Amino acid sequence: MTLTIKPSEIFGSIYIQMSKSDAHRALIASSLAKTPSIIKRWIDNVSVDVEVTKNAVSNFADLEIIDDNLKVFPKKEYKKELVIDVKESGSSLRFLIPIMSAFGITCTFTGSKKLFSRPIDVYKKIWKEEGLEFIHSEDSIKISGQLKASNFKVLGNLSSQFLSGLLFALPLLDGNSNIIIDGELESEPYVMMTLKTLKAANIETLRHDNNIIEVYGNQEYSGIDYEVESDWSHAAFFAAAGALGGETTLYGLNKYSIQGDKEILNILKFMGASVSYNDDNSITIKKTNRLNALDIDMSDIPDLGPIITTLAATAKGRTRLYNAGRLRYKESDRMNDLMDSFSRIGANIEVSEDEILIEGVERLKGGNTTSHNDHRIAMALAVASAVSDNDIIIDDAESINKSSFNFIEQFRSIGAKVVS
């Protein structure tokens, strides 16, 4: 699908959809429980990735949507051999692999070749050391065998999803386990989200300093009464649209959330945008003057990389995104693909091994570009229409559905001139 977005002034308000990250975790914890759960503020068909996890956990629980709530009823029996299509969802794959092995399920994960080219060696190494089967091909992964309690080493700077997957699975094992974090942990807010969900399900863990998490075995998940937060990662695109194109007011967000991507508001303030908290708990972001460049540590906020690139593309001065190397292992090689996608529409970007340097121009020229089939790059390019002299034409824009089925509709509602 190709999207054409004409230069647009932005003004309006929207309610931010439920958090993809929070929804993944709530689905998994509730499906592992011994008693029924209720997940509040549920929006069905919010994104491809959440639907992947929802379909997968239906192997362990029956799911029923009543009004705005998802009720989860655990099954007493489950199949010992499964095939699960994870499409392009790295979160689903990395969360589910340890859980399947905790139950001793033989499982074949299918999906896009692009997904199976992303890093998975953390699990492959552990499964080999534990004597379990782990067969990795270009379009699938097959695992079999019973995971047992042990000490598991995880690289801190690769993806927190490996750590979260183990955190979900290890309480089900017979005996205590330790997760040893090798190096400094990046994306820690995502780990904190997992621990928060586990606590809601009465699962106990103990963190020893910053590098060891002890997970007690022989635990049972309790049913949860859980309200899914709105998505700060998704809100960042609309916040940036307001800062560049006029004004946006965002509803539904928890300003005390542990989601790391709420940092977007601090970034916008430091760059010179107006950010105000309203009495009705909404947040308004207004364009002031041209934004200012900034040095930004990307360690805990890699998913903000694309939209920060949009902000920096026309900021005054040079923006430096450092500790950005993990962007190479997302839905695309985001460092090189961001450089390519934004250079095509007039941005001045350079990348090195661990940094992205963006020298701001006054306006983007627009033109034809591509998302590289990366949902966050596609949405970031769409927002760039607010500072473009000409239409921005995005190839592979269907990738947006990976994280949001209604982004285009909401973007139009605040003034964006989108042509499908």
Curated annotation (Swiss-Prot):
Its EC number is 2.5.1.19. Pathway: Metabolic intermediate biosynthesis; chorismate biosynthesis; chorismate from D-erythrose 4-phosphate and phosphoenolpyruvate: step 6/7. It is found in: Cytoplasm. It catalyses: 3-phosphoshikimate + phosphoenolpyruvate = 5-O-(1-carboxyvinyl)-3-phosphoshikimate + phosphate. Its main location: cytoplasm. It comes from the Bacteria. 3-phosphoshikimate binds at residues 20-21, 25, 159-161, 187, 303, 330. Belongs to the EPSP synthase family. HAMAP family: EPSP_synth. This is 3-phosphoshikimate 1-carboxyvinyltransferase. It comes from Brachyspira hyodysenteriae (strain ATCC 49526 / WA1). The gene is aroA.
